[in-house]
């Protein structure tokens, strides 16, 4: 199964979102359990989590390790642990969000692989959980992740596609959090508008918005910029924007493998790369 967004564990630990240690636990055990999980040292993380079973950190890390540690995987137990944490309003919100996304995502994946899991994934309504996460913290990275997993699924269903595209646009328009969280949604939109609608203009708009915000991966910035120029050139026929982005590509990535292609396309457009 796909591993959870373990980077959040680092943020949680670094932010000091850890509970008080009980008798007999190590001084920094909650922090260390989160740190070990973030480093994907599941053996150590699980060991530390078992020392603090009554803390939010212990429950979160134990549940996640049960899901993702293949050496001692117990999906049913992990899902139950995370469900108890997610629905407990006394728990820290960040932990509930992480638990909810992991719980819903594993249930979703199990339903997609019924030949392996049968009806075990039906125990949890992943769409309901994803939407609850989105409602609990609308501008958070957890809400973004929940939406991304959910909208991909809806776009795969022909009966839901039109409504899904509307929901996608609404989510992006109304998102109240950090815009830097949105480029993955814009990339998905670019792909799906081309795949399902042959709508290159809307696809280019999403790619442009994602590029202007900035992609987390530098290689995605590079490939996205070239793709943007290519879409305006070959698919949309907008010469000014094609020229603009080809020139920007050559300025930023003059030694890349696609630089010669960008130069040739500029010459094709009568610009000569100048």
Regions found by a protein language model. Give the residues of each.
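"A position-specific structural signal for the A-helix of alpha-solenoid helical repeats
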Residues: 31, 61, 65, 98, ...
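Hydrophobic/aromatic packing residues within the alpha-helices of TPR/SEL1-like helical repeat arrays
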Residues: 49, 79-82, 130, 168, ...
């Amino acid at each position: 199964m796909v591993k959870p967004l373990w980077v959040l564990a680092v943020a949680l630990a670094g932010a000091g979102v850890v509970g008080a240690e009980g008798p007999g636990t190590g001084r920094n055990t909650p922090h260390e359990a989160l740190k070990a999980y973030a480093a994907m040292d599941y053996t150590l993380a699980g060991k530390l989590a078992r020392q603090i079973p009554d803390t939010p950190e212990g429950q979160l890390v134990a549940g996640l390790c049960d899901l993702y540690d293949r050496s001692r995987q117990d999906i049913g137990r992990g899902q139950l642990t995370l469900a108890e944490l997610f629905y407990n309003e006394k728990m820290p919100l960040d932990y509930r969000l992480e638990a909810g996304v992991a719980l819903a995502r594993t249930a979703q994946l199990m339903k997609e692989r019924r030949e392996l899991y049968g009806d075990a994934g039906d125990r949890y309504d992943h769409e309901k959980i994803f939407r609850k996460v989105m409602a609990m913290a609308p501008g958070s990275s957890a809400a973004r992740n929940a939406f991304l997993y959910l909208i991909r699924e809806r776009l795969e269903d022909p009966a839901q596609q039109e409504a899904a595209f509307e929901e996608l646009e609404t989510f992006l328009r109304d998102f109240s959090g950090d815009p830097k969280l949105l480029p993955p949604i814009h990339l998905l939109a670019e792909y799906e508008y081309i795949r399902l609608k042959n709508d290159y203009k809307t696809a280019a708009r999403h790619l442009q918005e994602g590029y202007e915000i900035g992609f987390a991966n530098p290689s995605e910035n590079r490939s996205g910029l070239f793709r943007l120029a290519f879409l305006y050139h070959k698919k949309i026929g907008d010469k000014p924007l094609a020229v603009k982005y080809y020139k920007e590509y050559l300025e930023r990535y003059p030694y890349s493998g696609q630089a010669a292609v960008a130069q040739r396309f500029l010459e094709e457009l009568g610009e000569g790369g100048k």
